[in-house]
A protein has these predicted regions:
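ATP-binding glycine-rich phosphate-binding loop
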Residues: 20-35
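ATP-binding pocket architecture of kinase catalytic cores
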Residues: 35-134
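Conserved phosphate-coordination/catalytic loops
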Residues: 2-5, 28, 59, 116
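Short, flexible, glycine/charge-rich loop motifs used to bind or transfer phosphoryl groups or to couple energy/partner
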Residues: 11, 24, 78
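Short, N-terminal intrinsically disordered low-complexity segments that are rich in Pro/Gly
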Residues: 1, 23-24, 54
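Juxta-kinase regulatory segment immediately upstream of eukaryotic protein kinase catalytic domains
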Residues: 1-20
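A general marker of short, structured functional hotspots
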Residues: 6, 30-31, 111
Length: 134
């Protein structure tokens, strides 16, 4: 079975009875791939992470996400996981990038607010750091 077929089968078993479509959401500098799942019934979209276990262990990602959450940073909620297959179902934080949001000219103070939020999150993560943990 191809990897994408495995992902679809896992998602179908995780969300029984929900018809969904998958579309590429983004990529990062690893072997992980991300897909946005949209649902026929209009339920909120979700992000599905595919991290092939022979190339990428999702446990460090889960650990860092929890540390960031504990520090007050806005991170996706883990809704379901299959560590053996390397699949995670996550809340969807949206498709707007920071750059796109910064280019929005409807509010002259928007950039200042976005930068303040980002710096606040970075400071919170820094203050929550502990040697050997975060």
């Amino acid at each position: 079975m191809q990897r994408l077929e495995q992902l679809r089968a896992w998602l179908a078993s995780t969300l029984p009875g929900q018809a969904f479509d998958l579309a590429p959401a983004s990529a990062d500098a690893s072997f992980r791939r991300y897909f946005r799942a949209t649902f026929a019934d209009g339920s909120p979209s979700r992000i599905v992470m595919d991290a092939p276990p022979e190339k990428e262990d999702v446990r460090p990602w889960l650990h860092v996400a929890e540390l960031f959450r504990a520090a007050g940073a806005h991170v996706p909620e883990v809704l379901a996981q299959d560590l053996e297959q390397g699949f995670l179902l996550l809340s969807d934080l949206g498709s707007t990038t920071y750059l796109q949001a910064l280019k929005t000219q409807d509010d002259p103070q928007r950039a200042a607010h976005l930068y303040a939020d980002a710096l606040g999150s970075l400071a919170a993560i820094q203050c929550a750091s502990r040697p050997g943990v975060l």
